[in-house]
Every structure is written in C-alpha cells, then in structure tokens.
Amino acid sequence: MSDPMIHTITETDHIAYRRFSGNGPGIIFLAGHGSDMEGSKALFLEEWAQAHGQAFLRFDYRGHGQSSGSMDATNISDWTEDVITVIDELSEGPQILVGSSLGGWLMLNATLLRPERVVGLIGIAAAPDFTEDLILAGLTDDQRSQMQSKGRIALPNPYADEPVVYPYHLVEDGRGHLRLRGTLDIDKPIRLLHGMQDAEVPWQTATRIAECASSNDVRIHLIKDAGHRFSEPQQLDLLQQVISGLVADIIASGDQKSRLP
C-alpha cells in the first residue's frame, strides 16, 4: 500500500490521512482510542464508499498510527482539534461523521463546533465521557489516588498482553468535554450501533446519547451477541445498511453537494 498523505499542522505536528473523491455527502471515519485508520471498520467503509462513488476520508489522530506525537501526551482536546482540522482543511461540503468508541465522543464534539458542516452521525460503540464514566468510575479509591500521584495508571488490556496506560491529564482534560450531563444541542440524524456484549462501553451509553440529543431523528441498533469491536461480518453488514440508508436520507433532503474533492 502507498504511503498516506501528510497534512502539516506545525513544524513538529502532522496528521496522516487517506482521502478519496466522490459524491456528497462525504464520509469521515473517526477511529477508537489506541486504534488507527487501518482498522477493519475504516477499510470496510472505504471499500463501501468507493463502490458507491461516495467521498471518503480516514485519518490518524495525533499520538495514533502514522500521525505525529504520542498517545500519552495527547488528549480529548487535541483529538477534537484534529477532527476539526480534517473537516476544515481536508474536506469540503457536508459530511457524515462515523465514530467508533472514542470517535463517537469526538464526532459529538466536532458537530457542536461545526454544525454547518456535519449532516449526519453514526456511532459504533460510541463512548462519550468514557474518561469520567468508565475509567475513573471503575477505579478503587486507592487506584484513583495512585493515578493522581503518579500521573497515570496501567490497566489490563482486553486486546493485548501489555496493559493500557491512561494518563491523569486525559481524565482532567475530558472534564471539559463531557456530553452526557445535560441537553446535547445536536439536531442532526444520529444512528447508534452497539453490541449488548460490549465489555468496555455499556450499551446503555447509546440510550443516554439518544436521551441527551436534541434531535428527534435518532435510531439505535442493538446487537445482542456483539462485543465492543463490532467487526464481525454480520455487524459490518448492518453498518453498511445504516450508512446506505443515512446517505439516501440526506440526499433525499437535498442537504448535500453533488461531488466533493
């Protein structure tokens, strides 16, 4: 595979991305925490978009994949800035944001900041507020004290032998982006896919998003035997159905451009 394109932010910071031209609305994939743009869902959506002539973009947040920086030194604010950079500088016209896990949080942040550019949202095991509701809430008092005093904590990683390390500044920064504490001023079509066997992000998070969002066009798809990764063939088939339906709805509403770069 060819090297990704590089978008320079500063002398030391850059975002790696892959972009394909097509019809509007464009689709931007937002990966999960610790994941990158080469994951199965990103590649599946890219293949679908190319087959249907839809504009598509996937990228790595700073501290992830082939972008600059380290995950330990970046946070929700940084990754939200990366999504905004991609929307403002690497895409044109209306966009559908597809967010997986962490990406489901960032898509909410980005929509609040760029409501004129986002025309639809799809969350896959979306995890808004996970720093507070999942990481911090899951710690004992001793672990919380340790996290504060040492500046980080290492927890078991369900997908690898090495633990996942969460810096305390990630929790502190996350408090400025909590979205499920009141009304979420997003009046866009929202589609939420979640597995009921998700051991990382409870499926009830999807219902909380639906309850908080001001939009009445919110649909939740719960899959009883699906886990957090949501990457099995039947789960990807559902994702295909949902993205196809949302694109069709947006085109029917006239809220799109005919062709995007």
Feature map (PLM): residue ranges:
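The serine-hydrolase catalytic nucleophile loop
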Residues: 33-46, 204
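Alpha/beta-hydrolase fold nucleophile elbow
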Residues: 91-101
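Conserved alpha/beta-hydrolase
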Residues: 46-68
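Catalytic nucleophile-loop/oxyanion-hole region of alpha/beta-hydrolase
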Residues: 65-90
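Short glycine-enriched nucleophile-adjacent loop
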Residues: 104-115, 121
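The alpha/beta-hydrolase serine catalytic core
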Residues: 117-222, 227-261
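Short beta-strand element of the alpha/beta-hydrolase
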Residues: 24-32
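N-terminal cap/lid segment of alpha/beta-hydrolase-fold proteins
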Residues: 1-21
